[in-house]
C-alpha cells in the first residue's frame, strides 16, 4: 500500500525509522528497517537495539513529507508464558498452597497456565491490534515538514505499536 503524507522520520547509515501517529496521536506505529540491507541486516539492528538506541531514534524523529510504501501484513501468535513467569520468580502462584482467597474462598486456587494470544493487522485503514492473556486458575502539534521523496519497506523490517504519553510498547514484531 502507498501513503502520501507527512510523518515522522529518522535515518542514518544503519537504520530508517518512521513513526505513524494514529487518531488523536495517543498511539503510534513505529517501523524500522536497515538503511542498506547489504550492509546491515534486520537481525543485527534488533540485536543492537536497547533502550538508549530506541530513545535516540525517538528523540531524533523529524517531520517529513514523503511517499510511504508499506506492505499489508497480519501477524498472530500464541505463547505459553507459564515457564517465563516461573523464570521471573513467580513460583508460589503455581503451587497448590497458593493464596488466592481474594478471588475465591470456596476452593483453593492456583495457576495452572498463563497463555497470551496476540493479533496485529496493518492495512490502508490503519492498525488493528489485540492481545488476550489467559490465566487458567485451577482448583486448589507538527513542525514544518521537510521533503523526503519516498520510503519503501520492501525488505525485512521491525514494527512497534506504542502508547505515546508513557512510551509504553504494546506490540512489537518483525515482517520478513
Language-model features: locations:
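Mature hydrolase/peptidase catalytic cores and their serpin-fold inhibitory cores, especially
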Residues: 1-176
Amino acid at each position: 500500500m502507498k501513503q502520501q503524507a507527512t510523518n515522522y522520520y529518522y535515518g542514518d547509515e544503519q537504520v530508517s525509522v518512521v513513526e505513524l501517529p494514529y487518531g488523536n496521536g495517543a498511539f503510534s506505529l513505529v517501523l524500522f528497517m536497515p538503511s542498506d540491507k547489504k550492509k546491515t541486516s534486520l537481525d543485527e539492528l534488533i540485536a543492537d537495539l536497547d533502550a538508549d538506541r530506541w530513545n535516540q531514534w525517538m528523540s531524533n524523529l523529524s517531520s517529513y513529507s514523503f511517499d510511504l510504501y508499506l506492505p499489508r501484513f497480519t501477524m498472530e501468535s500464541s505463547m505459553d508464558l507459564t515457564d517465563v513467569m516461573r523464570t521471573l520468580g513467580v513460583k508460589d502462584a503455581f503451587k497448590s498452597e497458593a493464596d488466592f482467597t481474594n478471588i475465591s474462598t470456596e476452593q483453593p486456587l492456583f495457576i495452572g497456565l498463563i497463555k497470551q494470544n496476540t493479533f496485529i493487522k496493518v492495512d490502508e485503514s490503519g492498525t488493528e491490534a489485540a492481545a488476550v492473556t489467559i490465566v487458567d486458575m485451577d482448583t486448589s502539534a507538527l513542525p514544518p515538514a521537510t521533503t523526503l521523496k519516498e520510503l519503501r519497506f520492501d525488505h525485512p523490517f521491525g514494527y512497534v505499536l506504542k502508547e505515546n504519553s508513557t512510551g509504553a510498547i504494546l506490540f512489537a514484531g518483525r515482517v520478513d
